Amino acid sequence: MDPGNYRPVSILNILSKVLERTVHTQLVGYLEKKDIIFDYQSGFRSGFSTDTCLINLSDHVRSEISKGNFVGMVMIDLRKAFDTVDFNILLSKLKTMGVGNTDWFRSYLTGRRQCVSVGGTESNFLDIECGVPQGSILGPILFLCYINDMSASLNCRLSLYADDSTLIASGRDIQTLSTFLSGELESCSKWLVDNKLSLHVDKCESIVFATKRKMKVCENFQVTCFGTLVRRVSSVKYLGVMLDENLSGESHVSAIIKKVSSRLSFLYRNSRLLDFQSKRTLCSALVQPFFDNSCSSWYSGVNTNLKNRLDVLQRKMVRYVLNMDFCSHVDSSHFRKLGWLKIEDRVRYFKLVHAFKIYKGLAPQYVCEFFTRSSSVHSYNTRGSQTDYFISRDDTRASYMINSFTYTAKLEWNRLPSDLKKISNLHKFKAITRAYLFESY
């Protein structure tokens, strides 16, 4: 039990959280209205998620590979980022952003004391000299403000999800790409030092994406930070999804199979203790999320063999809930009885929900910018219908982009019946789309 693996959580009273919620609403409203938060920051923001972050990252990588480029990425690891925020620097940044009355924030941050309680024994109280209160409502948005100008020190693409940071660059020469990313990582390290944050170089990872044919050329790809070599990997875990060098999804599917098989084995061993509803609930809560997690970004790139292996696992889950024999055939009626969509249709469902948000302007701009509505191009009806549809750009037809979210989501949306596209409420759209997908069962 290494104490370094634990994080302090502030135990705050209810009244303080009521006040925090009011200030949070005002602060977020101001930052969004003035468009201050970094465009590619996906953490703790309404309409943003791990899904949108991964969709943007994977589609960008696919786009660059389709152009014949190598794509290098460095995963940055920060030491206790939330716990080392400097109060004075944060207050200065808030003032630069135009936030008034920073004295209130100074009072909120300073004067706090904490102790550690283990087994009923408490340590001495110590003053908190840095860090945003973890477990608070304001802490996350204050941290976003603190690292908001990180991108100003860089010339490469920066993708953020709270403190999960990635540096991304592309180019046709692998050696030039290595040198460029090394320089960018050093610039990032300098920015972190200036802002009293610490880079954990030993835990940083680098990866290069390319077609299988070009991977042999990538042997010399390596990223350094002031002489320290950053560990290169063939697959990297980012926001719960394994990304491999050619975005085949093989590493991620292998991880899913291992986790789902383990969970199902445990559930089978305890099946006699559970009734139908309990089994269904447990599978929905403990197993199904492995299939669903950010599936819009990775599933289309998976080959047929791997998709079949996922399908076999899902059918095994159906047999478990319905008390069927191991060799029993599972058909559409069994899925309908459980109210579960097959994996292929679940992916379609999630893509259509994202497409709806894009269509209605509810998704992040970094996703919406790849979608063009027909009404913004044509002033007349081109398909014999008044229903709007998405137009595909020429580059989305390139080989690597065919499996992208951008390309496949447009196809799914354009195939959707016109009456579904006219729905204005998101919750209603979700319900009716599920019913529409179940019609074929």
Regions found by a protein language model. Name each.
Residues 7, 23, 77, 94, ...:
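Short, conserved catalytic/metal-binding micro-motifs enriched in Asp/Glu and His
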Residues 228-297:
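Basic, alpha-helical interaction scaffolds
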Residues 1-133, 169:
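Conserved pre-catalytic core of RNA-dependent polymerases
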Residues 10-17, 42-51, 63-67, 79-83, ...:
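Conserved, non-catalytic sequence blocks in retroelement Pol enzymes and Pol-derived host proteins
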Residues 365-408:
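Amphipathic alpha-helical
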Residues 121, 183, 198-234:
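Short, conserved micro-motifs composed of acidic
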Residues 7, 41-45, 71-81, 131-139, ...:
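Catalytic palm active-site di-aspartate
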